[in-house]
Every structure is written in structure tokens, then in C-alpha cells.
């Protein structure tokens, strides 16, 4: 007994020591975690992992000497480590690359609310509750209301026509009916609190929302759909026909279909399913009406109505549905009608069947055309290339390479023109989509890691995807450099002039070609390519032209310096930089750019000269018109005109100046001076 007590005391003391050691390690780990959380965002995840390393290797080695106790301790340590990891790493760290591009985002209402704010009661939350039509909860609610509406559209008419269906499951129908009524009432309450956009902002004023909903036609239909027509059951009994007002809620079902078509990734397939559903509902209604007419005229009363030989519900409905399908699809092969009522119903069915057939042909044809539009356009391009190569008698090897390149595009779904698809979006959304799509690639590019967000937006929007086949040269040494490239997928090899010797391997995320388009002063190669780069397999690249890069970098001098310095480093390593000349940066302009600028300046000068010439011609025309008008005015007043006697005197050489002539001479002189001045101005 004494030995057993001593053993128990030793085990308990050992457990206490183990517990104290574990608690000490846990406290040190928690303090390390708190210090790690207090650092800035630049701390690495490795620090978090090392802070959670509980316990040390020596401690575990000491525990493993006692196997039962070691297993227990290992279990405790594993549980503690798992608990710490789950507590520390529950929140995912934001991506700094995306945060720098997107900028500060507005916090949601819960995070923006102060911590010491009083908790709102249910009544206060309900008074401020407003549903936005763009929320997911609104879409999910549309799903339930669409189910309730579809249930009424299918089952009410069937229960009204087939008495056996109504009687066999009476309590089930009562429960489902009142469940749909509850959903309808809740939907009306939600519609009273459904916000709408006004000047781009969500309206949350409950009084305004209520007035806006009440003034619509939909409110009147919704109100009629929830009228308690079941009160008439006390007079007529539980007749499903009294619940036909529930069918007025059909607009919510159509709204759900429209939103689903917008959200789904397979809109064409959904449209086909939606069309099939409409057709089945129409056939179902027609089958029920056919049975109701047969029952009203008398079962087996003639050859056209339902015979009623088999009284089972399933056979009865299947036969009516079969008759309705043959009639609406205009197949016929059914007994002809006998009575006038039967003829009217069959004629109406034929008209509806023609409309259904036309709808099916039109919709299915357009859907199939839309589904195959991309393939048809792609096949047209292939056929045009094949025809051209056959017409120009291109060799078989090159033709095979072209066909394989097209096959690669189609197999890897690279036939979509991104610029054409995204052209209707604003630049901000286009840039954000491009960032999310090409994020992994852009993160690996060193040139983009420190650039400003505005430059990143411009560069991403200017990138053009290109696909190269195995063995294609992206650029050759000595070529004029007009583009730089960023590798998205694939591998490229820097090869010698023979095309076989491989110097380096470029993988996804690398960029090249920027040296030849930067126009760095002191570069011995100028704007020429400095290496041969060849595609090993199929490679997806992003191309950025020289004009686009210069246009974007011109407004960001810091990024311009980074590009310049990186280009100098590469040239210095390759021995292609003349340090004595390398004093400038990207300001060097080659001859081609100078000629382009001179052409632009010449166009501007020609435009200005044409404008000045037009102004001169217009001014000259106005002056001539003024001189002509002045001459006509002088002639009209008689100034400067000679009478017959004065004319004879002038011919005889006798001066015949009168007093009026003396007074007229200064005026004539004045007119001559005015004309002289006008001519001088001209």
C-alpha cells in the first residue's frame, strides 16, 4: 500500500510538472502571438507558425520515454495546437496587391458601427429593415414564391377537374394551400419593404416605399390574390375553383426566371428548360379542360369525349395529357368532334397549337444559333484561312502548324476576344476584371509590384493576349523592338543564333522586350532586340506596345525611373551600356518618332494656314461688297454725273463749271480718297 501510494504521488507530481510546463509554453506562445498580431502587415506567416510550435523537441523527447504518458501528452499538445491555429487563422489576410489597386473600401454596416453602440431590439431592426433587389436573400425569396405560384398553377386546375385527385388527398391539399397563402402574405410584406434605386441610391424610406408599391398594378393583383375567398367554403364546400385568384401572383414566377437567366452560367440551357416548362403547363391545362368538358358532356357519350372505361386516376390523366399533346402539336390522329362545343374547343386547340409550334421553332432555333455562334464564327475564320492557304499554295507543313494552332485555341477556350466582350464595361470595372483574371501572372512580374495603382489600371487595359506555337520566334536579335511581352503560361527559351543552343529559360510571370522599347541613352543596341527568344511549347503572352507603354509611363515619373533603372541594370550586365553616354533616360527619341512628330506638326500648320486663308478671302469679299455698295449709293444720289450741256462743253474745250459743280468737287474728291483708302486696305 505504501509503495502504491508513493507511485500515485510520483505520477500526480509528474502530471503537475507536465501541466505547469504546458501552461508555461502556452503562455509564451500566446505572448508571441500577441506580439505577432501587433506588428504591421509585412510580417510573414512563418512567424505565426513558429509562435505556435508547442512544445520544444527536448520536451517531447523526455515525454516519449514514458509511452502511455507520452501518448496522452501528444494528444493534448495536438489539440492545443489545433485550437490555437483555429483561433489565430480564422480571418484571411487581405491581398495587398488587390488592396493597393482597389483603394480603400467602404466598410459594411456591422464593422462601421462602434463597439460600444447599444444593441438594437427586434422592433428597431424591423423598422429599419429594407430589402434590396440586388441582394441574394431577395433572389432566394423569389425562389420560394415562384414554387408557391407554380404549385397553384399546376395543382388548382387539376384538382378542380379531377374530383378523385381532390378527394383522395384532402388534408394534404389543405395544408399546402394554407402554406402558399402564408408565403403570399409574407411576400406582400416584403414587397412593402423592397427598396428601389432613385438617382443611383437605394431608397429606404418606408413611407415612400409603401406609396410607390401601392400605386403599381402589381399591388392590385397581389391584393386580389390574397383575398380570403375560402370563406365561401361554408356555402359551397371546399371547392378548388374558389382559389383561382391565387393564380394572379404569376409575375413573381416570371421575375425569378428572368433573374435566374441572368445569374446562371448556362443561359441557353435554362431558356430551353423554361420553354419546355411553359409548354408542359399549357398541355396540362388543356388536358384538364378536355376532361372537364368530357365530364360535362357525359363520359362515353360519343366517340370524342373520354370513354371513362378505366376509372384509375393515373390512366385518366395520362390519356387526357396524351390527347392534349397530340392536339396541340397538330399531329391529330384522334377521334373527330361530334357536337358544336367539341368543334369549338378543337379549333381553339389547333390555333393554340400553331402558336406553340411557331414559338418552339423560333425560340429553339435562336437558342441553338446562340449556342453555336462562337463555334460558327471560329469555324468561319478557319475556313477562310484554309481557303487562303490553298489558294496561295502554302506548303503542307506550315498549313498543319496553322491548323494545330487553331485547334489549341479552341481546345483551351482562347477564342474569345476579351476587348470585344468587355468593351461595354467602364474602364474601372474592366481593369478590376483584368486584375482578378490575371492576378497570379501580374504578381510575378517585378515591374508591376511597386507601380502606382493608376499606372496598373492603364497597363492592364492596354495588354493584348497572344498565343505562340511550339518553335515560333517571339523576337530575334537585331529586330526593331516595338512591343514588350509578359508570359502568362508556357515556357520560352533564350537561344543562340543557331536556334539550338539554349542560354536561359523564361517561365510564367517573366517579362522581356522592355529594353528595346525604352530608348535608354547609352544602349549600344539602340531600339534593337538583344536576344533570340523562342517558344518551347504553346505559350500565352501579354503584349504591350511601345506607344501604349510610353503613353502610360509619361504621367508616372516614378515608374519611369524604375523602368529606366531596371533596363540599365540589364544592359550593364550584358555589357551593352555605354556609361559615358548614359546620362539621360527615356527622353531619347529615335528618328521614326521625330518624323512622326514632324508630320503631326506639319498637319497642324497646314490646318492653321487653311484657316487664315479662309479668313483673308472672307475679309476681301466683304470689303469689295462695301465698295460696290458705296459706289451704287453715290450713283443713286447723282454725285459725279454730267448733264448733256456739260458734256458738249467738255467736248468743245469750254469749261462749264457751275456753282453746283464747285460744291460737288470736294465730295468727288472725298469719294476718291475713300476708294483709295479701301484699295490700300485691300
Curated annotation (Swiss-Prot):
InterPro entries cross-referenced by the UniProt entry: CLZ_dom, CNG_cation_channel, cNMP-bd_CS, cNMP-bd_dom, cNMP-bd_dom_sf, Ion_trans_dom, RmlC-like_jellyroll
Molecular function GO labels: cAMP binding; cGMP binding; intracellularly cAMP-activated cation channel activity; intracellularly cGMP-activated cation channel activity; protein-containing complex binding
Region (Disordered): 1-41, 649-682
Pfam families, sorted: CLZ (PF16526), cNMP_binding (PF00027), Ion_trans (PF00520)
Annotated keywords: cAMP, cAMP-binding, cGMP, cGMP-binding, Ion channel, Ion transport, Ligand-gated ion channel, Membrane, Nucleotide-binding, Olfaction, Sensory transduction, Transmembrane, Transmembrane helix, Transport
Domain of life according to the entry: Eukaryota
Compartment(s): Membrane
Organism: Ictalurus punctatus
Ranges facing Cytoplasmic side: 1-136, 191-218, 294-311, 365-682
Membrane topology, record value: Multi-pass membrane protein
Job description of the protein: This cyclic nucleotide-gated channel is activated equally well by both cAMP and cGMP.
TM regions (residue ranges): 137-157, 170-190, 219-239, 273-293, 312-332, 344-364
GO biological process terms, semicolon-separated: sensory perception of smell
Name this protein carries in UniProt: Cyclic nucleotide-gated cation channel
Lineage: Eukaryota, Metazoa, Chordata, Craniata, Vertebrata
Tissue expression notes: Olfactory neurons.
Similarity section: Belongs to the cyclic nucleotide-gated cation channel (TC 1.A.1.5) family.
SUPFAM superfamilies xref list: cAMP-binding domain-like, Voltage-gated potassium channels
Topology, Extracellular side: 158-169, 240-272, 333-343
Binding site for 3',5'-cyclic AMP: 455-577
Basic and acidic residues: bias regions: 20-30, 658-672
